[in-house]
Design a protein with these regions (language model features):
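N-terminal nucleotide-binding beta1-loop-alpha1 segment
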Residues: 1-16, 39-41
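Conserved N-terminal catalytic core of the sugar/cofactor nucleotidyltransferase
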Residues: 2, 24, 28-104, 113-115, ...
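Short beta-strand-to-loop element that shapes/binds the nucleotide-sugar donor at the catalytic cleft/hinge
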Residues: 52, 127-141
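Conserved beta-strand segments of alpha/beta enzyme cores
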Residues: 21, 70-72, 125, 193-195
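Hydrophobic packing residues within well-ordered alpha-helices of enzyme cores
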Residues: 11, 57-61, 215
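Catalytic-core segments of class I nucleotidyltransferases/pyrophosphorylases
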Residues: 43, 100-101, 108, 112-121, ...
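Active-site metal-binding loops of divalent metal-dependent hydrolases
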Residues: 7, 105-107
Length: 225
């Protein structure tokens, strides 16, 4: 599942006229980079949640056949998205009962997504891909010790927006309810049911217009190299 329903407030005015997921870097929309990596990793079915200007995403991507994928859309109120956990819960009927890969549309990362397809959760409710903390999020999100993600004070790493998730993680959330994912992940960590790994490769959280411009410059430089 790709989470693509966000309003993108910090990227306005660009996101006044397009959804953040369609913002381009290196000549491609952010969500297209994600979809191409998912297809290359062997995924074939992808659910995308939509809210703000979501019709533009659906019009651009269609059924996904051009990317070798079968896309389904989970639609939310355009001006009242359900947040991360709410979006997952709302798409539960499309996702089914098996663990699934979860990816934020507004990140760029060279993590090998095929590793998520091969991973078993082993009783955990989620497995998080973490990264060293960027300057804009120096405090991090979770500790990582012996493959377990936790809530201790330090040292922490940043959640990349990439995970393997058991649908049971969002069982407390009813379809149509608004809910954040972070409290559910913290509860899973407290219960010893959150695993993780550290990715030291390329990862960018594209939360602002400045970071989008930086990623665009990086990708275009790589193309020229």
């Amino acid at each position: 599942m790709i989470l693509a329903a966000g309003r993108g407030e910090r990227m306005r005015p660009l996101t006044d006229r397009m959804p953040k997921a369609l913002a381009e870097a290196g000549g491609k929309a952010l969500i297209v980079w994600q979809l191409e990596r998912l297809a290359a990793a062997g995924f074939r079915e992808v659910v995308i949640n939509l809210a703000w200007l979501g019709a533009q995403i659906e019009a651009r991507l269609g059924n996904g056949s051009a990317l070798g994928l079968a896309l389904q859309y989970s639609r939310e109120p355009e001006t009242a998205p359900l947040e991360s956990a709410g979006g997952i819960a709302n798409a539960r009927a499309l996702l089914g009962a098996s663990p699934f890969a979860l990816v934020n549309a507004d990140v760029y990362c060279d993590f090998d997504l095929a590793a998520l397809r091969a991973r078993a959760l082993g009783g955990h409710l989620a497995h998080l891909v973490l990264a060293p903390n960027p300057p804009h999020h120096a405090a991090g999100d979770f500790t990582l010790r012996s493959g377990k993600a936790g809530n201790a004070a330090a040292p922490r790493y940043t959640y990349t927006g990439i995970a393997l998730v058991d649908p049971a993680l969002v069982a407390p959330v009813r379809p149509g309810d608004k809910a954040q994912l972070a409290p559910l992940l913290r509860a899973a960590a407290d219960a010893g049911r959150l695993s993780g790994e550290l990715h030291r490769g390329l990862w960018r959280d594209i939360g602002t217009a400045g970071r989008l411009a930086d990623l665009d410059a990086l990708l275009r430089a790589r193309t020229k190299a």
